[in-house]
UniProtKB/Swiss-Prot annotation:
Residues forming coiled coils: none
Protein name in the entry: Fluoride-specific ion channel FluC 2
Entry annotated with the keyword Ion transport: yes
Localization annotation: Cell membrane
Source domain of life: Bacteria
Length: 114
């Protein structure tokens, strides 16, 4: 249980830090862009972690960290906000590239370590 608590807290702090840095240093950056990068990189890291066995506690710590780092709920909120603002094409593109990008990110991470 402690691994889950620590991992989730670390992941949430990392997500906050990446989002803040993205907004501060990115050219015309939007939070949506930071969420996209966070989710794709988180999937790639998860693929890397799961490609080969790790000690149980370490694996649980990393999976919990990535659960706190990635943010499916914010992704959904942003996609629905685009849809609500009648930016339907942008919403669909965001949905597709996020889902496909996350799948390919996971495969990339898996293949790097496998």
């Amino acid at each position: 249980m402690m691994y889950v608590i620590i991992g989730g807290a670390v992941g949430a702090c990392l997500r906050f830090a990446v989002s803040e840095c993205w907004l501060k240093f990115g050219k015309n950056a939007q939070l949506m862009t930071a969420v996209f990068v966070i989710n794709i990189s988180g999937c790639a890291m998860l693929g890397w972690i799961l490609a080969k066995p790790l000690p149980e506690g370490i694996e649980l710590l990393f999976i919990s960290m990535l659960g706190g780092f990635t943010t499916f709920s914010t992704f959904c909120m942003e996609a629905l906000e685009l849809w609500r603002l009648k930016k339907r094409k942008q919403a669909m593109i965001y949905l597709v590239i996020s889902i496909v990008g996350s799948l390919f990110g996971f495969l990339f991470g898996w293949n790097v370590r496998a």
